[in-house]
Amino acid sequence: MGELHSVASAVTAVAAEAAEEGGKQNNFLIPNGTFFVVLAIFLIVLAVIGTFVVPPIQKVLKAREDMVTKTAEDNRNAAEQFTAAEADYKDELAKARGAATAVRDEARAEGRGILEDMRQRANAEATAVTETAAAELARQGEVTAGELATNVDSLSRTLAERVLGVSLSEPANAGRG
């Protein structure tokens, strides 16, 4: 700051001196003192800006560039991870579908086996019941046939007596033959 103040006072002094010399004729090809003073001020301002202003700006720009580079790299990595995860997901989904299909087919086959077993049991049970019923009917038929065979003689005698009107149980009639 002190340098700028001293430079500014030097510039005003040179400007005052040039104003006093204003009466003299100046050649525009020969530089006067103001040119060198303005050049010195320009170089000082340039040095101050280069020293105090440009490095922080460059630092911020570098940090932002690094941040953008890191973000782009992170995005690229995330895209690769997403692609890999999606491929894994599709593979696992295909495996799960295959497993589900296998389980479903196995369950259907097991169901068919159980159904066939139940049919065989029902058929065997029906056959057993039919055979038991047939045996029972045959037994009852034999019993009934035996009862009828024993009762046929007495029934036929009773019927003949009623039709003929004669008693066949008498001993005289029994001798006739």
From Swiss-Prot:
Keywords: ATP synthesis, Cell membrane, CF(0), Hydrogen ion transport, Ion transport, Membrane, Transmembrane, Transmembrane helix, Transport. One of its GO terms (cellular component) is plasma membrane. PANTHER family: ATP SYNTHASE SUBUNIT B, ATP SYNTHASE SUBUNIT B', CHLOROPLASTIC. It is found in: Cell membrane. Its main location: membrane. It is a single-pass membrane protein. F-type ATPases have 2 components, F(1) - the catalytic core - and F(0) - the membrane proton channel. F(1) has five subunits: alpha(3), beta(3), gamma(1), delta(1), epsilon(1). F(0) has three main subunits: a(1), b(2) and c(10-14). The alpha and beta chains form an alternating ring which encloses part of the gamma chain. F(1) is attached to F(0) by a central stalk formed by the gamma and epsilon chains, while a peripheral stalk is formed by the delta and b chains. F(1)F(0) ATP synthase produces ATP from ADP in the presence of a proton or sodium gradient. F-type ATPases consist of two structural domains, F(1) containing the extramembraneous catalytic core and F(0) containing the membrane proton channel, linked together by a central stalk and a peripheral stalk. During catalysis, ATP synthesis in the catalytic domain of F(1) is coupled via a rotary mechanism of the central stalk subunits to proton translocation. Component of the F(0) channel, it forms part of the peripheral stalk, linking F(1) to F(0). GO terms for molecular function: proton-transporting ATP synthase activity, rotational mechanism; proton-transporting ATPase activity, rotational mechanism. It comes from the Bacteria. InterPro entries: ATP_synth_B-like_membr_sf (IPR028987), ATP_synth_b/b'su_bac/chlpt (IPR002146), ATP_synthase_B_chain (IPR050059). The chain crosses the membrane at residues 35-55. HAMAP family: ATP_synth_b_bprime (MF_01398). This is ATP synthase subunit b. Belongs to the ATPase B chain family.
